[in-house]
A protein has these predicted regions:
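Chromatin reader modules
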Residues: 1-117
């Protein structure tokens, strides 16, 4: 499905944001779906009802599966919020997700201002 009118440029910029996140060494925990079976995190699907990761988001962007940049941003925010919901407040994973959440919010706010949506 093609993006809605006026969303082509914002979605192109979202691809750049996602690629820049994926390139970061410390972003490894967010690149692929959580292997909850392999990690024996059997409660994960009960706690996290909408699993999301940056690799999946990138594939959805490449396949034009987002109508708007806002829908893509929601999925990116799920990556961070899922991590913070599942992991203990103040843990290494929680702190990493919190840091990425803040950075992403800043970049997305800037994108919205520049693209005027």
């Amino acid at each position: 499905m093609p993006p809605l009118p006026g969303q082509e440029e914002p979605l192109k910029r979202m691809i750049k944001i996602v690629n820049s996140l994926l390139a970061r060494q410390d972003c490894a925990p967010f690149r692929e779906p959580v292997d909850w079976r392999g990690l024996e995190l059997y409660d994960y699907p009960q706690i996290i009802t909408k699993m999301m990761d940056l690799g999946t988001i990138k594939r959805k962007l490449e396949r034009n599966q987002y109508l708007t940049a806002h829908l893509c941003a929601q999925d990116i925010k799920f990556v961070w919020s899922n991590c913070m919901k599942y992991n203990a407040d103040g843990s290494d994973f929680w702190l990493l997700a919190k840091s990425y959440s803040r950075r992403f919010d800043d970049r997305y706010r800037k994108l919205r201002q520049e693209c005027k949506f």
